Curated annotation (Swiss-Prot):
Name of protein: Light-independent protochlorophyllide reductase subunit N
Annotated compartments: Plastid, Chloroplast
UniProt entry tagged with the keyword Plastid: yes
Main location: plastid
Family: Belongs to the BchN/ChlN family.
Assembly description: Protochlorophyllide reductase is composed of three subunits; ChlL, ChlN and ChlB. Forms a heterotetramer of two ChlB and two ChlN subunits.
Keywords attached to this entry: 4Fe-4S, ATP-binding, Chlorophyll biosynthesis, Chloroplast, Iron, Iron-sulfur, Metal-binding, Nucleotide-binding, Oxidoreductase, Photosynthesis, Plastid
SUPFAM superfamilies: Helical backbone' metal receptor (SSF53807)
Keyword 4Fe-4S: yes
Highest taxon, organism lineage: Eukaryota
Cellular component, GO, one term: chloroplast
Organism: Chaetosphaeridium globosum (Charophycean green alga)
Length: 458
């Protein structure tokens, strides 16, 4: 990270523990994004209960994920793990015939040292379906890092651009179409990584196309069979701040060139993201300032609500720095940015933009607390009395009972917040508790908790 940033940004690390949503929840959006995939979570009943509650399973929907439930025989090594997983995968092949099966490791597989990585290649050769192994245990990873481990594993399976270009692919194949596009470009191939809804990904593609930049592919792609070509000369750029492991894999293993840019969250972040990609390719960006100003003009009704209000990030989904930067630009005061894990190299451009935003808005730099201690945070909130706390679900009700308005951080993970046009959705989420409080005050209800009754001695 740049020394200029570290001189002004204050980083602290408290407990060293993660207080976040479980990372296996990445299955919720990844199985929908990769349409020909099947996700198999290898864990205990607790993992199954969590998935059922977090993902809202419908009985007749037959979603493309399942639980391989570990029993006493598995844990005590009385059963053959390989044979058990083989039976399950054969059943998946018979029922669904996916293009890829993704094994998701959990806390239990980590504790009992289950060798999923060792079993997968053998079983893959036997059943004829690619098996990708990703560890998403809550011991080592925070909430959204589950996606990071899956994409890092999938990056290893992407075809090599130099090998594919030498082969004579038929014109109808995905590989040849990608190569055809890249040959027409006036810039090196660009691959974007990060799982976004198709509509949002299309919006970002269109914004880059307006600057004469063609996107060669996405990781993950909508189909496993359409994974992008990777290799030397391919530029990659992330859209989410929690994908540091994927970025490292793309650089070290696949020899790609990483474009270190702020993340396209909010109009300011989206503009900076596009400008950085343009600068790497030597392209002069056109009309971005007007585009950004147009979006800000459309957000005035929300900005009037949040201007001057204070917010406290407890830390959960690793989107905290980007969201804080956007809210500071909207006129809010950020007291503290709690974050479970901070890769200062991968987020260097985002941190630089945060610093610049604070200087432009003439507000003090917020503290950035990595792996925050929740008890200490509650004490700090009691002193600061922020207008809003963005927190994990576990702390929302207790904080509300103490008179602090809250917003679940998990909602920002599942909402569409990337790009120019989705900035309104971020402010819609942020202002909802503030608008609710205003409505309650209009009704004369200033407290959501009854005062404690006084006992009269008999």
């Amino acid at each position: 990270m740049n020394s200029a940033i570290s001189d002004t940004l204050t980083f602290e690390c408290e407990t060293g523990n993660y207080h976040t949503f479980c990372p296996i929840s990445c299955v919720a959006w990844l199985y929908q994004k990769i349409e020909d995939s099947f996700f198999l979570v290898v864990g205990t009943k607790t993992c199954g209960y969590f998935l059922q509650n977090a993902l809202g399973v419908m009985i007749f929907a037959e979603p493309r994920y399942a639980m391989a439930e570990l029993e006493e025989g598995d844990i005590s090594a009385q059963l053959n793990d390989y044979q058990e997983l083989k039976n399950i995968c054969l059943q998946i092949k018979k029922d669904r015939n996916p293009s890829v099966i993704v094994w998701i490791g959990t806390c239990t597989t980590e504790i009992i040292k289950m060798d999923l990585e060792g079993m997968a290649p053998r079983l893959e050769a036997e059943i004829g379906i690619p098996i990708v192994v990703a560890r998403a245990n809550g011991l080592d990873y925070a909430f959204t890092q589950g996606e990071d481990t899956v994409l890092a594993a999938m990056a290893q399976r992407c075809p090599e651009i130099s090998v594919a270009s030498k082969q004579n692919q038929p014109m109808g194949s995905a590989f040849s179409q990608t190569l055809k596009v890249s040959n027409q470009q006036d810039h090196p191939p660009l691959v974007l990584f990060g799982s976004l809804p198709s509509t949002v990904a299309s919006q970002l593609d269109l914004e880059l196309k307006r600057q004469s930049i063609e996107v060669s592919g996405w990781l993950p792609s909508q189909r496993y069979t359409d994974l992008p070509l990777l290799g030397e000369g391919v530029h990659v750029c992330g859209v989410n701040p929690f994908l540091s492991r994927t970025a490292t894999t793309l650089m070290r293993r696949r020899k790609c060139k990483l474009i270190s840019a702020p993340f396209p969250i909010g109009p300011d972040g989206t503009r900076a993201w596009i400008e950085k990609i343009c600068s790497v390719f030597g392209i002069q960006p056109q009309g971005l300032e007007e585009r950004e100003n147009q979006i800000w003009d459309g957000l005035k009704d929300y900005i009037d609500l949040v201007r001057g209000k204070s917010v406290f990030f407890m830390g959960d989904n690793l989107l905290e720095v980007s969201l804080a930067r956007f809210l500071i630009r909207c006129g809010m005061v950020v007291y503290e940015i709690g974050i479970p894990y901070m890769d200062k190299r991968y987020q260097a451009a985002e941190l630089a933009l945060l610093q610049k935003t604070c200087q432009d808005m003439n507000v003090p730099m917020p503290r950035i607390v990595e792996k925050p201690d929740n008890y200490n945070q509650v004490q700090r909130m009691r002193e600061l009395q922020p207008d809003l706390a963005i927190t994990g679900m576990a702390h929302a009700n207790p904080l509300e009972a103490r008179g602090i308005s809250t917003k679940w951080s998990v909602e920002f993970t599942f909402a569409q917040i990337h790009g120019f046009t989705n900035a309104r959705d971020i402010l819609e989420l942020v202002t909802r508790p503030l608008r609710r409080n205003h409505s309650l005050q209009g009704l004369g209800w200033s407290s959501l908790v009854k005062e404690q009754n006084q006992l009269i001695p008999s």
